C-alpha cells in the first residue's frame, strides 16, 4: 500500500502539479510532506498527517515551515551513556 501511494504522489508531482503552478503555502510542499509522512509512518498514519496538513492549507492560514512529526519509535536517545 505504501509503495502504491508513493507512486501516485510521484505521478502527481511530475504530471499534475506543474499544470497547477506553485500554490502551496507551506514548506515543504504538501505533496513532499505526504511522501515524507507516508515513508516515515506508513500508509494509514501518513495519510492522516497528510489529511491534517491539507486541511490547514487554506487562505486563512499563513503557512510557513511545517515538518512531519518524528516517530518516537524511530528516534534515537539524545543522551547516550558511555
Curated annotation (Swiss-Prot):
Keywords: Cell inner membrane, Cell membrane, Membrane. The keyword GTP-binding does not apply. It comes from Rickettsia rickettsii (strain Iowa). Could be involved in insertion of integral membrane proteins into the membrane. It is a peripheral membrane protein. One of its GO terms (cellular component) is plasma membrane. InterPro entries: Membr_insert_effic_factor_YidD. Belongs to the UPF0161 family. This is Putative membrane protein insertion efficiency factor. It is found in: Cell inner membrane. PANTHER family: MEMBRANE PROTEIN INSERTION EFFICIENCY FACTOR-RELATED. Its main location: membrane.
Amino acid at each position: 500500500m505504501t509503495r502504491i501511494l508513493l507512486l501516485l504522489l510521484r505521478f502527481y508531482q511530475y504530471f499534475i502539479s506543474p499544470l497547477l503552478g506553485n500554490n502551496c503555502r507551506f514548506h515543504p510542499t504538501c505533496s513532499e510532506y505526504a511522501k515524507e509522512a507516508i515513508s516515515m509512518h506508513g500508509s494509514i498514519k501518513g495519510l492522516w498527517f497528510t489529511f491534517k496538513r491539507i486541511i490547514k492549507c487554506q487562505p486563512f492560514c499563513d503557512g510557513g515551515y511545517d515538518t512531519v512529526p518524528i516517530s518516537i519509535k524511530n528516534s534515537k536517545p539524545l543522551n547516550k551513556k558511555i
